[in-house]
Amino acid sequence: DRRQRQMCIRDSIRTSGFDEMLDKQSMQIFYEDVLREVDVYNNDITLLQTRFVSPLSRIAPEFYKFYLTDTVYVDTTRCVELTFVPRNASTMGFTGRFYVPVGDSTMFIKRITMRVPHDINLNFIEGLSITQDYVKAPDGSRLKMVDDMTLEARLMPGTPGIYGRRHTVYDGHNFDPAPDPEIFSKGGDQIKAVGAEYRGQKF
């Protein structure tokens, strides 16, 4: 049903640093496999061919321990802070926190922050963290506004470390029927706008 399909248009893409160290093909693999977009609402999250149980999956209560740790403001919204850690430290899970507006009976998550524990072996990745922000649409559905992933890596022992970041901002959400339904026949859920790689830093 095309009315339920989603499409993201990438208006601006900017890279700095990595493109000076890796060739174009290696860069593509790096972004698709390491700095890939993560859907925290999936039961499993795959990073570097390693499957992690999402803290928001159906089996999360069996896999994670949850603690009510604080009440804080996220932007201007007063939220309850819930901390989660794997029940078994040796399993593939995240540590982190999510924030739910005080009094929200739907348990809508406004922000989630999570990281891969340092004692988990992820090949050359020494540290990886994810932060995502959401707002509630008028119909109650969730809209992702910010997706921020940072990592620390060391490609070979004894070499300098690498710091990488993928910061994505979403806006202009539009629920009107697509003016050209054929846009959904192109495959995938993202379209790169013409000239996206050449936008200025102030775009």
What are the residue ranges of the model-derived segments?
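Low-complexity, polar-biased intrinsically disordered regions enriched in Pro/Ser/Thr/Gly
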Residues: R3, L155-P160, K186, I191-A193
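Short, small-residue-biased leader/transition segments that mark boundaries at the very start
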Residues: R2-I9
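Edge strands and adjacent loops of beta-rich recognition modules
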Residues: D39-Y73
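Short acidic/polar alpha-helix capping motifs at helix-coil junctions
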Residues: I29-D33, P61-K65, T95-F98
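Gly/Pro-enriched, hydrophobic low-complexity segments
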Residues: V53-P55, Y67-L68, Y73, T77-I183
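Long, low-complexity, polar/charged, intrinsically disordered or flexibly structured peripheral segments
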Residues: R10-L48
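Interface/linker segment at the passenger-translocator junction
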Residues: P181-F203
